[in-house]
UniProtKB/Swiss-Prot annotation:
Species whose genome carries this gene: Myxococcus xanthus (strain DK1622)
Superkingdom of the source species: Bacteria
Gene behind this protein: rplJ
UniProt function note: Forms part of the ribosomal stalk, playing a central role in the interaction of the ribosome with GTP-bound translation factors.
GO CC annotation, single: ribosome
GO molecular function terms listed in the Swiss-Prot or TrEMBL record: large ribosomal subunit rRNA binding
Key words of the record: Ribonucleoprotein, Ribosomal protein, RNA-binding, rRNA-binding
Keyword NAD: no
Listed GO biological process terms: translation
InterPro entries for the chain: Ribosomal_uL10 (IPR001790), Ribosomal_uL10-like_sf (IPR043141), Ribosomal_uL10_bac (IPR022973), Ribosomal_uL10_bac_type (IPR047865)
Family note: Belongs to the universal ribosomal protein uL10 family.
Protein name: Large ribosomal subunit protein uL10
Subunit structure: Part of the ribosomal stalk of the 50S ribosomal subunit. The N-terminus interacts with L11 and the large rRNA to form the base of the stalk. The C-terminus forms an elongated spine to which L12 dimers bind in a sequential fashion forming a multimeric L10(L12)X complex.
């Protein structure tokens, strides 16, 4: 790789690392192509970027970004799983996928909004609901009082209508 290509790659990675909300460093050993393809598909579905990067380039690109706190972990055969939105997505996908092939994927560390997280933290993060689930829960919490209010306001009118209908039925019968 030419020096100009390396500099361009570092610049591109630095820009990505600057936008990162969370990233997980994982070691993949003896993983076959089919498994990596399935994993990449899961990452795409979760809007997570999966990158295998030269460690020296990744360390240089991480300087001055939130990813710099995990730059020392860029050693050996590692991949970086990056999210720009949902902070739990990379951890959730990796931990779920690692259950099937535990001996081949080893989670090393992660960074979540600028803070370094160890393996136990990554596993705990994976148990949290993702952004879509949180939005749905929040919507439910917000809409429930409004629904109760509408039912309460409508109740006297519907009760009155039932009384009038009962009287009408009684008069006809």
């Amino acid at each position: 790789m030419l020096k100009s290509e390396k500099e361009e790659m570092i610049k591109e990675l630095h820009e990505k690392f600057s936008r990162t909300t969370s990233a997980v460093v994982a070691e993949f050993t003896k993983v076959d192509v089919e498994t990596v393809t399935k994993l990449r598909k899961k990452f795409r579905e979760g809007n997570v970027e999966y990158k295998v990067i030269k460690n020296t380039l990744a360390r240089r690109a991480a300087q001055g970004t939130s990813v710099s706190v995990i730059a020392d972990d860029f050693t050996g055969p590692v991949a970086l799983c990056i999210s720009y939105g949902d902070v739990v997505a990379p951890a959730k996908i990796l931990v779920e996928f690692a259950k099937d092939i535990e001996d081949k994927i080893k989670i090393r560390t992660a960074v979540v909004e600028g803070r370094k997280v160890d393996v136990a933290g990554v596993k705990a993060l994976a148990k949290l609901p993702g952004l879509p689930e949180l939005r749905a829960q929040l919507l439910g919490v917000i809409s429930e009082p409004a629904s109760k209010l509408v039912r309460t306001i409508a109740a006297p009118g519907s009760q009155l209508a039932r009384v009038v209908q009962a009287n009408a039925d009684k008069a006809q019968g």
